[in-house]
A protein has these predicted regions:
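Long, hydrophobic alpha-helical segments that serve as membrane-spanning/inserting helices
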Residues: 14-229
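Membrane-embedded hydrophobic alpha-helical segments
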Residues: 1-19
């Protein structure tokens, strides 16, 4: 009888630990779902702004290539003022980082989920690399912006927000020197190229996030159902 009682005690304790681990696993999965949903929403905003940036860059190139800067000075200044401000994606990978450092990935019993999430997290490394490359190209472009554009016009365009307003009148650029303009366009080309690359990568990343989110919800329908309540 004593043996049975001891065995039963071990069984109850082990069962309790299983329940606790299962609850922790569900909490981790719910946290991952939150991270992915946040990423998807954030990427919606970033993608839209990147598409707008592409239009602005193409407009600048068209205006300057066709010698229309005197006709579209207001637009030129407005588009140029946004060049140093590419939309940045900040990945919400808090849960992934916490699990890597705590070793609690072991609580997730589904190995496919673990592999998928780790692969998703690896994409952030590439995103950060491209972000650094873009920052370098934008810094190079600053020198030409300072030569071509009147800082007092830019100052007029400031508002108490992260956005800008169109300048009044039809301001002119500082020079019509072709060498100066071509140098600006050359550097702008590289900024455009990295923006196109970023835009494509963000779209792929968002698609992957949606696929992973659906996969997790299929594998953990109870967690998904609980979140919908």
């Amino acid at each position: 009888m004593l043996f049975i009682a001891i065995s039963l005690g071990f069984f109850v304790e082990n069962y309790r630990e299983v329940l606790v681990d299962r609850q922790k696993e569900k909490e981790i999965i719910a946290s991952f779902i939150n991270d992915l949903e946040t990423d998807i929403k954030e990427l919606d905003i970033v993608i839209q702004r990147r598409e707008t940036r592409e239009i602005r860059i193409d407009s600048i190139i068209y205006i300057l290539n066709n010698g229309l800067q005197d006709d579209y000075g207001k637009d030129l200044y407005y588009y140029a003022r946004y060049l140093p401000r590419p939309a940045v994606f900040w990945a919400n990978n808090t849960t992934n980082e916490e699990l890597k450092y705590s070793g609690n990935f072991i609580l997730i019993k589904n190995q496919k989920i673990i592999d998928t999430l780790l692969q998703y997290n690896d994409n952030f490394i590439f995103i950060d690399f491209i972000k650094e490359r873009e920052e370098y190209l934008v810094r190079r472009l600053f020198d030409q912006i300072n030569v071509l554009f009147d800082p007092m016009v830019f100052d007029e365009m400031n508002v108490y927000d992260i956005e800008f307003v169109y300048p009044s009148g039809n301001p002119k650029i500082n020079t019509k020197n072709k060498d100066v303009i071509n140098l600006f366009l050359s550097n702008l080309h590289y900024v455009k190229t990295v923006n196109v690359g970023q835009l494509g990568h963000f779209k792929k990343h968002q698609k992957k996030a949606k696929e992973i989110l659906n996969f997790i919800k299929e594998e953990y329908p109870d967690v998904a159902a609980e979140k919908r309540k």
